[in-house]
């Protein structure tokens, strides 16, 4: 229901703003821009996202099936089970969904978006199997989605690569700020959903895992900043991500071989579902992308940024960060739009400027909430999303606020 009202609001708000621009400012091109944008968004949803996703989904669902036959998913479920059983109490012990979620979070941590999406869709399908109300998002599905939308990433590889292309003196200088901001977003999302679902986080297992993850991140930050040069950080990030991913593939294959599984047939069996899954999500994907495009092309976001700037000026708050806000505002709506805005900001202000760096941290501090909701819930036919969107946006907001503070600390 929330998604229904939100979708309607995007169109109505865009229409009202466009009408004001036409009547009071003589902008005769605004409605053409919006209508052209609807066709472009629909095309992008199918040709640039859904169809390429067919190949990726086919590959990784095949690999995942090999992993399941090899027992790797159950192995991961047993390791992470004690922690996940506390924050996902609805998921039975050693259920495959646990392993699928671990694979998704791991791919996100490594910044491997192409692998994370198939893992995430598989996890959502596994959670749907134990969902008693197939039209309504379960507590476990909401927790998973909010943690996913917080976008916890250790290695923002694509952002560092874009900074290098634009000639940044130190492309990796946003590495630690991105890690801190996205970690804050994840923790806030976890706590908020746990409170809503009455999950006790003051548990020795939960505290131990969260403490261990925090120490691991702190150790990584210390090691990267004290023992590696800027160039080495980029090389290690790039090599480690792809090495770990390919190692997982080989481990799945060897594990299946050890169990005398016909590996190729297992791959084909899993890969068959790739096309079906992508066809299922196309209507949800196109509907959300068109609504987002309408809102963006109407100029609503620009007016919101101007309003924030006016408020901050009158409150006596430093407004050096406001030119980077469009990236933060577009990120929950569109990953490609946020990337384009980040690049445009760096081109306008310079990749080594405060605003340029902050736009990069914004881009790495959270994920595309509305896209993920449409994609993941659409893949399993969820129509009632309950509180998934507001809590996902809360995690995004926490990441944005953290990004501002961290950027002032590191770059201002």
Write out the residue ranges for each language-model feature.
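Generic serine detector
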Residues: 41, 77, 85, 106, ...
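Signature of multi-pass transmembrane helix bundles
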Residues: 1-55, 164-296, 313-314, 387-412
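Sparse, context-dependent recognition of short Cys/His-centered cofactor- or disulfide-binding micro-motifs
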Residues: 61, 95-97, 137-140, 242, ...
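C-terminal transmembrane helix pair
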Residues: 115-116, 123-164, 168-199, 325-412
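Short hydrophobic/aromatic segments of transmembrane alpha-helices and their interfaces
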Residues: 39, 98, 135-138, 246-247, ...
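Membrane-embedded alpha-helical segments and adjacent helix-loop junctions characteristic
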Residues: 29-129, 259-348
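Short glycine/serine/threonine-biased micro-segments
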Residues: 12, 60, 69, 109, ...
């Amino acid at each position: 229901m929330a998604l229904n009202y939100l979708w309607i609001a995007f169109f109505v708000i865009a229409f009202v703003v466009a009408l004001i621009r036409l009547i009071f400012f003589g902008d005769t091109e605004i409605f053409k821009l919006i209508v052209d944008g609807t066709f472009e968004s629909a095309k992008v949803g199918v040709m640039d996202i859904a169809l390429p996703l067919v190949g990726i989904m086919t590959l990784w669902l095949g690999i995942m099936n090999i992993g399941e036959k090899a027992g790797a998913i159950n192995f991961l479920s047993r390791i992470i089970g004690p922690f996940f059983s506390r924050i996902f109490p609805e998921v039975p012990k050693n259920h495959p969904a646990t392993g699928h979620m671990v694979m998704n979070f791991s791919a996100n941590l490594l910044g491997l978006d192409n692998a994370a999406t198939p893992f995430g869709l598989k996890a959502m399908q596994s959670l749907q199997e134990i969902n008693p109300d197939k039209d309504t998002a379960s507590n476990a599905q909401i927790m998973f989605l909010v943690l996913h939308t917080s976008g916890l990433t250790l290695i923002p590889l694509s952002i560092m690569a874009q900074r290098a292309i634009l000639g940044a003196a130190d492309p990796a200088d946003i590495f630690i700020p991105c890690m801190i901001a996205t970690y804050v977003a994840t923790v806030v999302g976890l706590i908020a959903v746990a409170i809503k679902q009455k999950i006790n986080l003051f548990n020795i297992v939960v505290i131990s895992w969260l403490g261990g993850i925090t120490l691991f991140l702190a150790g990584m930050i210390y090691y990267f900043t004290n023992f590696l040069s800027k160039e080495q950080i980029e090389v290690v990030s790039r090599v480690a991500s792809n090495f770990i991913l390919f190692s997982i593939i080989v481990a799945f294959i060897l594990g299946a071989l050890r169990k005398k599984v016909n590996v190729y047939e297992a791959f084909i069996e899993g890969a068959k579902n790739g096309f079906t899954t992508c066809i299922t999500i196309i209507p949800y994907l196109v509907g959300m992308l068109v609504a987002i495009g309408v809102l963006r092309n109407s100029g609503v976001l620009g007016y919101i940024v101007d309003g924030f700037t006016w408020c901050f000026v009158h409150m006596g708050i430093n407004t050096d960060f406001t030119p980077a806000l469009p990236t933060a505002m577009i990120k929950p709506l569109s990953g490609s739009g946020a990337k384009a805005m980040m690049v445009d900001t760096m081109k306008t202000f310079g990749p080594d400027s405060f605003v340029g760096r902050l736009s990069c941290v914004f881009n790495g501090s959270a994920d595309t909430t509305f896209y993920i909701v449409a994609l993941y819930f659409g893949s399993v036919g969820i129509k009632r999303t309950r509180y998934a969107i507001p809590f996902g946006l809360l995690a995004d907001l926490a990441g944005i606020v953290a990004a501002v503070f961290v950027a002032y600390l590191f770059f201002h």
